[in-house]
């Protein structure tokens, strides 16, 4: 059984715990952290499918900067901003950086779950395209493999 992994990043501890518990209740593997820095550390250790990310987090890096760094660590992770402070500027900047969507807090699970399902599908589609592309760039020759992407021979 495939377990989808969701990381919730929010400085409001009560909100964070509530969302994580509700996601786990629905069979998702959910993790919660209170800062952008903690999220980046977790992403270095654990593969995540979707990140629910607050934009305004005091005392450290904000959601926009966290998103910039997320895309360097796990470029295929889908990011949905969950925020009470969405502005047109932050929405545009987030979308340019690769955010999948924005939801305004308080968010209802009836609204969040379809967005998560769509984000999982999108991530899976991206992964399948990459796998397909990598397979298509390999040519098998007796005794060796030639990788068209790197233009070099690889031993079996």
Language model regions located:
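Short hydrophobic/Thr-rich beta-strand motif most characteristic of the beta2 strand and flanking loop
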Residues: 27-35, 42
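Conserved acidic segment of CheY-like receiver
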Residues: 3-14, 19-23, 51
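Active-site residues of response regulator receiver
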Residues: 10, 54-55, 83
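Short amphipathic alpha-helix used as the core "switch/output" element in two-component signaling
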Residues: 41, 61-75
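CheY-like receiver
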Residues: 122-156
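Active-site beta3 strand of CheY-like receiver
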Residues: 46-52, 57
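C-terminal output helix
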Residues: 107-117
